[in-house]
Amino acid sequence: MKKEIIMALAISTTNLVKNFDGKNAVNGISLDVHQGEIFGILGPNGAGKTTFLRMLATLTKVTSGSASIFGNDLTKDGAKVRNFIGLTGQYASVDEELTGMENMIIFGQLNGLSKKEAKKRGLELLKQFSLTEAKDKSISAFSGGMRRRLDLAVSLITKPPLIFLDEPTTGLDPRTRGEMWKTIRELVKGGSTIVLTTQYLDEADQLADRIAIIDHGSVIAQGTPSELKNILGETTFELSLIKSSQIKQAKEMIEQKFNIEVIVLPEFATLSIKVTDTKIMTQILLLLETEHIAINEFETRKPTLDEVFLELTGK
Amino acid sequence: MDTTVINKNTTTMKTISLKSWLTDIIVMAKRELLKVKHSPEKLFDVTVMPIIMVIVFSQLFGGAIMGNVKAYLPLVVPGILIQTLVMASGAAGTQLREDLDKGATDRFNSLPISRIAPLAGTLISDIIRYIIAAVFALGTGAALGWRASAGFGWLLVAIGRLAIVTTWALSWLFALVGVLAKGAATVTTISSFLTMFLAFLSNAYIPVTSLPKWLKVIAENNPVSHLITAFKEVAYNGNFGHEAWLVLLISLLIVLILAPVTVLTYSKKN
């Protein structure tokens, strides 16, 4: 039974450490990535995201700790692990002088496909990524966004079940970024597991099923985007009243009855209340109703991932 | 047991064998050649350069050094050939550095290939560049009246068994420079300095007898001088003598020492 659970994990790391010149770039990361999910690794520049990814992609040696990829030990079975992974780095690493198809064939053959198979699969991928115009032309003639897409397409030539994307949209314009997101979502539909690093909160929020926030080489929070938002634990409940003359009365009543702090934003006759228990909101509305304080409108607001991030990293 | 999981995703499991190992190296070499196909200007240093060098040097210095151009050709043509080859061998380092900087090396290292393949591929595709260099340098020389007096067969021996083997060995030195240096520009600077030093402080352009004594000692012991002397001995006299064997021995030593060091540094770099 236990074995089955391990098998269902795409990645499992225990206390993974990478030391560079006496300093721990990755300082004991333990996490599990399930099959078929998009796992986001979020953190500021220099937090250790890329180093962590490089260890998992067998590019850099693990200093201590252990990790397994589909049940294969990362340090002992590196060669085998490389069959399961596709890597797209921070910079487009395809050969710009070469055509789209030539790049496909080279990477296909290096992955063990025959030239014919590589060609066939390359053609499929070029179509899938709307790159057919780059088939017989040097990549250097195309935009940065296209190069990134080709870079991603190339890493999919053998349909790897696990794909590492290191900051896949850094430096892309908003439109191309949107296209990249779409592509990434489609990959998961095909059954792949994706681990992506990003420093964009909205990217993690949009794409990731689960997120680990990394700072100074350690995981400081982990969970689904909404779980992380709940870390701050508060929903902001904002009420605006029709009569601004009643605002002081309303504030005092609510504070007394529920023993919570109410902030008054006088210019809009608005009360802002941070609530941890959503039931209080209904009770507040009922209280105001019985006291004949008419409400103009109200809204609730969850904290943004930005707020969570800033709170956690203390920046 | 892993297959139950992986099957879903139809992963191609690559079997590592001697054949796959060779294929990887050939594919990596092909990659370099495709680059040349798309940017033929990358062959400037092994085509246009040797043509110009042979013409300019023979016409410019022929009279001054040997009295006339024809008498200078036997000295300068092998000199320029070897100089071109030595300089061409420096390009390997720049190429490796560019791949490291661009992230291409990372990409390759995440593939199920032998880690030596990218390095070996680059160095093997270079051999084709060396052959091109030899054809252009010697072809220009021949057009001006230079002859390999021992005949075509011995000339091929001199090129294939001596000049190219030695240059290839030397390219490991520049590969190491490429792996160690900070950027592609640094590699080019270091390689140019080394190749200039090796080529000019030798018997490539002048008879060393004309040099001041201290310089003569340096020039005579320069490995490039040994190579040029050996080349002439084979191409002119049809004699693969002790000088030639000495040069091959030095080349073998260079490869035996530098190849493991370079490969180790290259994979340790991560």
What are the residue ranges of the model-derived segments?
Chain A
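ABC transporter nucleotide-binding domain
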Residues: 182-275
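ABC-family P-loop ATPase nucleotide-binding domain
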Residues: 1-17, 314-315
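Short, surface-exposed acidic/glycine-rich loop or hinge patches that mediate macromolecular interfaces
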Residues: 72-75, 219, 244, 275-278, ...
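C-terminal coupling/interaction segments
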Residues: 276-315
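Active-site-adjacent beta-strand anchor residues
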Residues: 97, 240, 274, 298-299
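A short linear hydrophobic-aromatic micro-motif
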Residues: 130-131, 259-263, 294-299
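ABC transporter nucleotide-binding domains
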Residues: 10-13, 18-215, 219-221
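Structured loop/turn residues at secondary-structure junctions
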Residues: 21, 134, 144, 242, ...
